[in-house]
Amino acid sequence: MASALSNASRRGVAVRLAFNVDHANPIPVPPPPGGEPSVIDGLDVPTKPIPGVPDLMHHKYVVRDGEAVWTGSTNWTDDSWSREENVIAVVESTGVAHSYSTDFEQLWSTGDVAQSGFVDPNPIKVDGKRVRAWFAPGRGEAMAIRIAHRVARAKTRIRVSSPVLTSAPILGALAEAVSDGKVDIAGVVDATQMKGVYHQWMLNGNSDWKVPLIARVLGGAPFSGKLSTPYGQGDVHDYMHAKVTVADDIVFIGSYNLSHSGEVNAENVLEIRDAELADRLAAFVDEIRARYPAAPLPA
């Protein structure tokens, strides 16, 4: 990837790279990606470090020539490509590219996560399909509520793939759907990271009210959990990292973990109404969850 960026610059392409900068605060759950400073420093392109304080610059997207967007859950690290479950979406649309370019300019001009994501999620037609681009933190709360709304309105199926699951509106919608028992619901999380979430909840006591919700969701529907390697410098990073929600024929795909903290990170999500794509991604979620045992429940 580094070579591709440098080669594009040498061809005369205007390349800019914004990236998250680590900080000394406690490691969040899920943990941020680990970049290689020497690789970034060696790039022959303008770069912009975005301080991940207090909230992460968590995007993984590219805008090409104002015509296409490459996005999803995949960090640009070796382990992301070889050891983790991830998703990538490529959208050829000037309208979608404009939305992503607007978000990028907000980050680039301010260098501040909190000043980005203020992009209206207006519907855009792409090959006859309706697409909306959501960004956080500017539209983070609305983004989570939108996903929860679609989950609550689902009539036939819900599929979820997310390293963690802590967003209150989404948890509430899932718990209600599981309790109603009218919709085919299944999903997959990262077991190690969910155990970390439970530990944090136990220590701070501020999220005790979420415990029955997550227990209802993970215990009442077939959710699996990948027992990944715990986070640590130099360790293997093999998380279950795909971020996908399918509600009937609507897909949400991007960088956003279904977490409360994700609402204030720099994040992006594509909402796509496409029955064929929904079938494909629902099958992908089922393929992942078939690999792993049942997700852990809070003690």
Per-range role (PLM):
Residues A2-V69, T74, D78-R83, V90-S109, ...:
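PLD/PLD-like phosphodiesterase catalytic module centered on the HKD motif
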Residues K155, S162-L165:
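Long, repeat-rich segments with strong aromatic
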Residues A24, A133-F135, S161:
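Short, contiguous strand/loop micro-motifs
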Residues S109-G138:
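Active-site cores of enzymes that catalyze phosphoryl transfer or operate on phosphate-rich substrates
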